[in-house]
Amino acid sequence: MIQTQNYGTGRRKSSSARVFLRSGNGEIVVNKRSLNEYFGRETSCMIVRQPLELVDMVDKFNIYITVKGGGISGQAGAIRQGITRALIKYNQTLRFELRKAGFVTRDSRQVERKKVGFRKARKRPQFSKR
């Protein structure tokens, strides 16, 4: 039996996710653990489910995800973009709706580097006039 699957890659901050969509009953597995077990936070789980809820396909696919790098927020954003790209490969007509919601565009914001002589990226040491 040949099982068709759609693949999508997502990135956010320093996280990258590989997403595989297969037809199924709505099971989401992240790094061989269930979605709720992996993230724990409901907000992160909501971010992951957003593209599926938008196109009403929550119970249509089983999703297998490998994600690495970054923290919880970055990983959730990377998975969301990966699911979006996989859905577009599955059905090209979903692209307009997903783009309108802002899920197709990669969030290019990165952590600003710390500068020499500053305490953080922009925080300067206290200035003394005299």
Curated annotation (Swiss-Prot):
Pfam families named in the record: Ribosomal_S9
InterPro entries noted in UniProt: Ribosomal_Su5_D2-typ_SF, Ribosomal_uS9, Ribosomal_uS9_bac/plastid, Ribosomal_uS9_CS, Ribsml_uS5_D2-typ_fold_subgr
A Gene Ontology BP annotation from the UniProt entry: translation
Annotated keywords: Ribonucleoprotein, Ribosomal protein
MF terms (GO), sorted A to Z: RNA binding; structural constituent of ribosome
Gene3D superfamilies noted in UniProt: 3.30.230.10
Gene Ontology CC entries for this record: cytosolic small ribosomal subunit
Alphabetical list of PANTHER family matching this protein: RIBOSOMAL PROTEIN S9 (PTHR21569), SMALL RIBOSOMAL SUBUNIT PROTEIN US9M (PTHR21569:SF1)
Family: Belongs to the universal ribosomal protein uS9 family.
Family annotation (HAMAP family): Ribosomal_uS9_B (MF_00532_B)
Name this protein carries in UniProt: Small ribosomal subunit protein uS9
Species per Swiss-Prot/TrEMBL record: Buchnera aphidicola subsp. Acyrthosiphon pisum (strain APS)
Taxonomic placement: Bacteria, Pseudomonadati, Pseudomonadota, Gammaproteobacteria, Enterobacterales
